[in-house]
Amino acid sequence: MHELSMAQGIINAVIDTAESNNATEVTEVGIEIGRLAMINPEQLRFMLSVLVENTIVEDADIKIEEIPVEINCPECGFKGVAELDDKDHYAPIVECPKCGNKRISILNGKDCVVKNIVIEKPDDD
């Protein structure tokens, strides 16, 4: 259930950033979740919807994008997107789609990142 702590961290970062920029409201938050981050996007979305209540993020459009796993295979030289065998949610298997090698380098797809925040600021009258 680490989605709750992840959601809390995201909301704290968004609110801190918005407040440091004198925002009156957050209208959009873009989040990228790597397939290897072990975060369920639906659970994260639910946790976020609860945590934003009565904050400047409450009415924001929260966009969550899943990022594929990108690898580099030292065996055959493949560099690109790999499929993820996640039958076992806690220990997914990533292998080279070209040669089947499991000793690969992960280039992308492990992180959870707040990619963008759109805010409203008070009118300068």
Swiss-Prot record:
Transmembrane segments: none annotated. Ni(2+) binds at H2. Belongs to the HypA/HybF family. It comes from Methanobrevibacter smithii (strain ATCC 35061 / DSM 861 / OCM 144 / PS). Keywords: Metal-binding, Nickel, Zinc. The lineage of its organism: Archaea, Methanobacteriati, Methanobacteriota, Methanomada group, Methanobacteria. This is Hydrogenase maturation factor HypA. GO terms for biological process: protein maturation; protein modification process. HAMAP family: HypA_HybF. Involved in the maturation of [NiFe] hydrogenases. Required for nickel insertion into the metal center of the hydrogenase. The keyword Zinc applies. GO terms for molecular function: nickel cation binding; zinc ion binding. Disulfide bonds: none annotated. Zn(2+) binds at C73, C76, C96, C99. Pfam families: HypA.
